[in-house]
Amino acid sequence: RPADFKLQVIIIGSRGVGKTSLMERFTDDTFCEACKSTVGVDFKIKTVELRGKKIRLQIWDTAGQERFNSITSAYYRSAKGIILVYDITKKETFDDLPKWMKMIDKYASEDAELLLVGNKLDCETDREITRQQGEKFAHEITGMRFCEASAKDNFNVDEIFLKLVDDILKKMPLDILRNELSNSILSLQPEPEIPPELPPPRPHVRCC
């Protein structure tokens, strides 16, 4: 049967944190040891069933390099869920989180669900960021969840996406979901302005 709803999720974070690996593990159950850096925006689609509903999930994988920010910023606007990823073995990717929160504050809708993910848990012996540091950062952001994962070992990957989708469904009445998300969302051409039917940009929130 056709999907009941269509949802957009965007994955953001610094270069090399494993955004593409998380997406491909979830959608295709594959893992690439030496994935090429994403140029601009890539996407995959996966259909999931939650709460008795069939949901077509479009996942946008964004480039982490600053030179692509002008391209990727347009995709924040209609995303109902945002996954912010850092590498637990690279402190600089954790230090970049406030920068990414500024992008969220500026471009994302106010009702977007937020999830912070510490990736590469398979490299525990090389850890530079403790779980407590990740939890503390997420705790200081209103409504942000936190978890650690490993795309390589397929640990917590499904849980990341399914929990995010479940949070979106719980937050939005079904009639609103049906009205807002029934239109086709498969075009990857960003609009230069926020469409009038979308929520306003997310107001500034405390990020650190």
Swiss-Prot record:
Lipid linkage positions (S-geranylgeranyl cysteine): 207-208
Keywords linked to the UniProt accession: Autophagy, Cytoplasmic vesicle, Endosome, Golgi apparatus, GTP-binding, Hydrolase, Lipoprotein, Lysosome, Magnesium, Membrane, Metal-binding, Nucleotide-binding, Phosphoprotein, Prenylation, Protein transport, Transport
Group of enzyme by EC: hydrolase
Annotated membrane topology: Lipid-anchor
Pfam families registered for this protein in UniProt: Ras
Annotated control of activity: Regulated by guanine nucleotide exchange factors (GEFs) including DENND3 which promote the exchange of bound GDP for free GTP. Regulated by GTPase activating proteins (GAPs) which increase the GTP hydrolysis activity. Inhibited by GDP dissociation inhibitors (GDIs).
Protein's UniProt name: Ras-related protein Rab-12
